[in-house]
Amino acid sequence: MDRGISAVRKAMAPLLEYERQLVLELLDSDGLVVCARGLGADRLLYHFLRLHCHPACLVLVLNTQPAEEEYFINQLKIEGVEHLPRRVTNEITSNSRYEVYTQGGIIFATSRILVVDFLTDRIPSDLITGILVYRAHRIIESCQEAFILRLFRQKNKRGFIKAFTDNAVAFDTGFCHVERVMRNLFVRKLYLWPRFHVAVNSFLEQHKPEVVEIHVSMTPAMLSIQTAILDILNACLKELKCHNPSLEVEDLSLENALGKPFDKTIRHYLDPLWHQLGAKTKSLVQDLKILRTLLQYLSQYDCVTFLNLLESLRATEKVFGQNSGWLFLDASTSMFVNARARVYRVPDVKLNKKAKMSESAEGQETKKELVLESNPKWEALSEVLKEIEAENKESEALGGPGQVLICASDDRTCCQLRDYLTAGAEAFLLRLYRKTFEKDSKAEEVWVNLRKGDGPKRTMKSDKRPKDTKNKERASTKKGAPKRKKRELTLTQVMGTAEEPPEEGAAEEDQQRQATSSPEGCGGEIQHEAFDLNLSSDSAYGILKEPLTIIHPLVGCSDPYALTRVLHEVEPRYVVLYDAELTFVRQLEIYRASRPGKPLRVYFLIYGGSTEEQRYLTALRKEKEAFEKLIREKASMVVPEEREGRDETNLDLARGTVSTDAPADTRKAGGQEHNGTQPSIVVDMREFRSELPSLIHRRGIDIEPVTLEVGDYILTPELCVERKSVSDLIGSLNSGRLYSQCLAMSRYYRRPVLLIEFDAGKPFSLAPRGSFFQEMSSSDVSSKLTLLTLHFPRLRLLWCPSPHATAELFEELKQNKPQPDAATAMAITADSETLPESDKYNPGPQDFVLKMPGINAKNCHSLMNHVKNIAELASLSQERLTSILGHAGNAKQLYDFLHTAYADVVSGGRVRK
């Protein structure tokens, strides 16, 4: 019973020796900590949270996710901390947030809320003890977190700033990236802790786990497919270089193409000119993505799933683009032939008759013989589990059987492993084949009959090695009796179900459903919740006395700490890494070092000489090179004394853009500086999700955050700005929302402005490349903008290439202009009856008149200047309307509309019918 309770309520392990050394250095001086992936950046952050969980402190935490905040709070609760961290969200009203801050402790708050509270002085800046920043590599100049840190340093010179990140590769891009991040963080010290650090390496080597590397050989068909995909990938890369010579040749190597960040690298180079690229280049980028997916499916999933993906890609030609030619390469033919050979084979007699290749598909399917090649890793996993089971039978010296944790890359792989361990490879693949290719029922019968035959006949019918057949038999034999005896201890725990073992029919239906279900079916979060549920009853605690096997995904869980929880709650003695993942490998090293004296064996399954192995080694190499570059930058880095901003000498804290080279106007008071009112802009609360308010504040303009119904930025009492990104602009034009917004701005402000802001790093073009049509189209963005400006003559369009340019433009528009009033801006709503004095028309009748035939935005004001109300309008003659509107056709339409009898309209409609 005690053992079960300790498994559930397991606190985070104490700091290791090198971690304590780093904490002492960080306590002595603020700085940025860059450690290797998996070496415990979250553990360091948790320790500082633990130190400041006291009402006498007020510490803000930036850049954390809700799941991470929940994990930290639960860990502190387990340790018995009384003053737990609190989360400030939109559910807490703005008036009550000041009380939350003054109660002290740790505060998790969104960046938007903190920015608004700093600007409105709702947070006691002078009482803040310090700020902890997580994922510090994301702190660029224009982001919200950098804005918060700048506001904090302007108002508080004593508080600490400590930043943590485990992504050293992120600092490998751009010029002096780490120095710019430290500048935005206001820290002087850089703490680098790679895996090859002397203190880290020496300590972990003393407590390293027992590692068993198993290099699994791919089948000949898999090797042929991998070679074919790599050849096609290399050909596509060469063609991409030919079409785009400006691309970096080093980044477009075949080795980099195997890594996870390759898609981001390609888009980083091509996004700024994406709208200028031809169809061939865009098609090649899509092909590279598909080929990388094929490589992943080859090593990750079974032969049926891989063939299904290939066939679906060939059937859907639009996936490859119009000009893709790699489908006609010899390597592509080899890939399709070998992929089909892994699933089924056609008798040689059939293949030799080339004249009959045009027969119907049904005739071919009747003579297919299923092969259903098993994944080699499955058999290796069965051997590992068999070895663990044998050791557990003789584990009295170690205190009983050890628990087993199997880690695969994603939920889908976990589901397949569970079904394989439940039913065996043959039954699982046959069931999956039936579900995927339902029309091949006759081929299934042939395969089933072959399996019922004798052993030699099976060997001759299949091209696989006899060793593979024996391994399959061993795997199915191994899973025979123990599978039934320990079903509750393995499979139900894997899927997180606390039900009775189902009957055979129900179990088969469930396995069929899970085999091809969506990845959400085996989520780590569901598994963990069910694991806690199983431990909640007294009878369930006894489960831990028997070998427990859990299959868990490495990535893709909604809870990023689900695997960490399972690791510390189950405390497995054996961990099987079905897929290689650098972060979790390091996490296992920390786990072993924090439990001295307790055995841990790690089985490392990997395809030898495969792209999977190459990806893992490339990730190791890139991280090592990134740390070496950071070490060189740190050695040559020049950090000014005022970097931390603890006095007024730091220029980064200065606001305004007045240059010493700017000429003074000597006609006004001899060039003396004019001490006028401080410029300000009223900003809508929702705009604080963007980086523009930060840049406006940086230019010396005060920001008043309020909730606006009309406009996003009020620059002057007469000038209102509605900001739109390109995607938002297109969506608002299509939905008609932009028309309503422009109507409201035109009605209540003399100078309405539509600001279209596009990112310089993203593609944007109003007209397609090489084509421009004179005729207007209802679906064209340019046409819709033209109609918008025709309908609202006072509306002005501003085009800005970046938020920095927008902030500069706002500053120029505000020069020598009166400041807006926040209360007045808040009082203006879309349904407000109060109008500026310059507008002398009621909006209701004006909208009504605009909907009449013959009335448009050009002649509407002329008509309203001559007519007081609708009754007077109805009394005018057609000649008088012609003189007012200036157009006989419009006057006739309006006159007929006003004076035609309803009965005539109805009768006329019947005649037309």
UniProtKB/Swiss-Prot annotation:
One of its GO terms (cellular component) is ERCC4-ERCC1 complex. A motif (Nuclear localization signal) lies at residues 483-488. Residues 1-454 are annotated as: Helicase-like. Its cofactor is Mg(2+). Residues 453-476, 638-649 have a biased composition (Basic and acidic residues). Residues 680-760 form the ERCC4 domain. SMART domains: ERCC4. GO terms for biological process: cellular response to UV; double-strand break repair via homologous recombination; double-strand break repair via nonhomologous end joining; negative regulation of protection from non-homologous end joining at telomere; negative regulation of telomere maintenance; negative regulation of telomere maintenance via telomere lengthening; nucleotide-excision repair; nucleotide-excision repair involved in interstrand cross-link repair. It is found in: Nucleus; Chromosome. Residues 270-298 are annotated as: Leucine-zipper 2. The modification Phosphoserine is found at residue 518. The keyword Nucleus applies. Residues 233-254 are annotated as: Leucine-zipper 1. Residues 453-525, 638-677 are annotated as: Disordered. Keywords: Acetylation, Chromosome, DNA damage, DNA repair, DNA-binding, Endonuclease, Hydrolase, Magnesium, Nuclease, Nucleus, Phosphoprotein, Repeat. CDD domains: XPF_nuclease_XPF_euk. It is an enzyme of class 3 (hydrolase). Residues 500-509 have a biased composition (Acidic residues). The modification N6-acetyllysine is found at residue 289. Its main location: nucleus. Its EC number is 3.1.-.-. NCBIfam families: rad1. Catalytic component of a structure-specific DNA repair endonuclease responsible for the 5-prime incision during DNA repair, and which is essential for nucleotide excision repair (NER) and interstrand cross-link (ICL) repair. PANTHER family: DNA REPAIR ENDONUCLEASE XPF. Heterodimer composed of ERCC1 and ERCC4/XPF. Interacts with SLX4/BTBD12; this interaction is direct and links the ERCC1-ERCC4/XPF complex to SLX4, which may coordinate the action of the structure-specific endonuclease during DNA repair. This is DNA repair endonuclease XPF. The lineage of its organism: Eukaryota, Metazoa, Chordata, Craniata, Vertebrata.
